[in-house]
């Protein structure tokens, strides 16, 4: 477990307009909480997810009503759509025909080989990948009988069995997940899977819990896996508004420097030295930069002891003291501003920095 693994050679798999695996950045996914047959509600939720930074969205497809709604949903959203299928191969066929960008199935639980073959052939014809979703809580009986309880080896064995079914049908556009609610089990399963095959891995800690506890549990588990160099796409699973899943996922990726299009906030812990309303200012700035797709660090520091030094580590920042603040940019003081306009002035500088980034990006792209 202590050997660091880098997965640059992971097989690239196309999901809509995104490439999962290869040398591409990790993508963030979520799943809707609406009834999929309610097109209006589902599309509205997906639009909120898109705005929050979701890059791929999955919807449940438990019946024909849901399957029949997929085409209408697909036409009204702007990110790849994944259909989650269990047991009924006909729903997978309907989803593929509706134009989804990926299906999530376990080939071993949709029936006879001829049914699997129909799904695979349909997916091949439309270049639609398949995600094999192994879950510690629903492993096959024979695997539980073999190992006695859910184990990492059992999860990888299950994944390999499903992979073989697809490979035997000459299908290789495969993504694999090995989810568990036990953090240590998930870490071990993903570690072993990364050594067993080179298909892209979809990361997740399943049934992680509520917004607060589940967010921490997911961050701990996903962070440990990411620190091994493992993972190509991820979902934070919370018993909460799915938009909250995106917020946690973005922060996890930013913490590891794995997101090139997200701003990061640095703010100091509160203490008796603070002489400005740091908590209010930090929260407002965090909300402001949440949708800024620029890899900048923004610092909000509350005193003159550590503030100036820590602010210099950021691209832009402010260090407050005695009801006023020093604005820093790339380690240099820009100006001193009173607390009453501190946030507005910082926002202006953030906007200027973001605009400069986009101009440079356009200039670089024009030279290629």
UniProtKB/Swiss-Prot annotation:
Any one GO MF annotation of this record: 4 iron, 4 sulfur cluster binding
Keywords recorded for this protein, A-Z: 4Fe-4S, Iron, Iron-sulfur, Isoprene biosynthesis, Metal-binding, Oxidoreductase
GO biological process, alphabetically ordered: isopentenyl diphosphate biosynthetic process, methylerythritol 4-phosphate pathway; terpenoid biosynthetic process
Cofactor requirement: [4Fe-4S] cluster
Protein name: 4-hydroxy-3-methylbut-2-en-1-yl diphosphate synthase (flavodoxin)
Taxonomic path: Bacteria, Bacillati, Bacillota, Bacilli, Bacillales
Organism: Listeria monocytogenes serovar 1/2a (strain ATCC BAA-679 / EGD-e)
Pathway info: Isoprenoid biosynthesis; isopentenyl diphosphate biosynthesis via DXP pathway; isopentenyl diphosphate from 1-deoxy-D-xylulose 5-phosphate: step 5/6
UniProt key word Cytoplasm: no
Cofactor detail note: Binds 1 [4Fe-4S] cluster.
EC code(s) of this entry: 1.17.7.3
Family of the protein in this entry: Belongs to the IspG family.
Residues where [4Fe-4S] cluster binds: 268, 271, 303, 310
Short name of any one Pfam family annotated for the protein: GcpE
Recorded superkingdom: Bacteria
General function of this protein: Converts 2C-methyl-D-erythritol 2,4-cyclodiphosphate (ME-2,4cPP) into 1-hydroxy-2-methyl-2-(E)-butenyl 4-diphosphate.
Keyword hit for Metal-binding: yes
């Amino acid at each position: 477990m202590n050997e660091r693994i880098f997965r640059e050679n992971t097989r690239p798999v196309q999901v809509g307009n995104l490439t999962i695996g290869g040398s591409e950045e990790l993508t963030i996914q979520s799943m809707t909480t609406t009834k999929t047959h309610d097109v209006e509600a589902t599309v509205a939720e997906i639009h909120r997810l898109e705005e929050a930074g979701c890059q791929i969205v999955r919807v449940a497809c438990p019946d024909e009503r849901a399957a029949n709604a997929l085409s209408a949903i697909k036409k009204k959203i702007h990110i790849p759509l994944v259909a989650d299928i269990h047991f009924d191969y006909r729903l997978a066929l309907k989803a593929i025909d509706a134009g989804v960008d990926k299906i999530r199935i376990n080939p071993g639980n949709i029936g006879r080989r001829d049914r699997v073959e129909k799904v695979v052939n349909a997916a091949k014809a439309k270049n639609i990948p398949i995600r094999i979703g192994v879950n510690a809580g629903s492993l096959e009986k024979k695997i539980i009988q073999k190992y006695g309880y859910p184990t990492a080896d059992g999860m990888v064995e299950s994944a390999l069995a499903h992979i073989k079914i697809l490979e035997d049908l000459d299908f290789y556009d495969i993504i694999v997940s090995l989810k568990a609610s036990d953090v240590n089990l998930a870490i071990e399963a993903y570690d072993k899977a990364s050594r067993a095959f080179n298909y892209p891995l979809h990361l997740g800690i399943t049934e992680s819990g509520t917004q607060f506890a589940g967010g921490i549990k997911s961050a701990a588990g996903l962070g440990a896996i990411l620190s091994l160099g493992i993972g190509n796409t991820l979902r934070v699973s919370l018993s909460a508004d799915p938009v909250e899943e995106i917020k946690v996922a973005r922060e996890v990726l930013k913490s590891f420097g794995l997101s090139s299009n997200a701003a990061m906030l640095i703010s100091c812990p509160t203490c008796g030295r603070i002489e400005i309303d740091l908590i209010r200012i930090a929260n407002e700035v965090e909300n402001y930069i949440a949708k800024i797709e620029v890899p900048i660090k923004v610092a909000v520091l509350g005193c003159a002891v550590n503030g100036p030094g820590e602010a210099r580590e950021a691209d832009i920042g402010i260090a407050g003291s005695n009801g006023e603040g020093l604005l820093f940019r790339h380690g240099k003081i820009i100006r001193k501003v009173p607390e009453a306009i501190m946030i507005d002035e910082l926002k202006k500088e953030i906007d200027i920095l973001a605009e400069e980034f986009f101009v440079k990006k356009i200039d670089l792209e024009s030279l290629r």
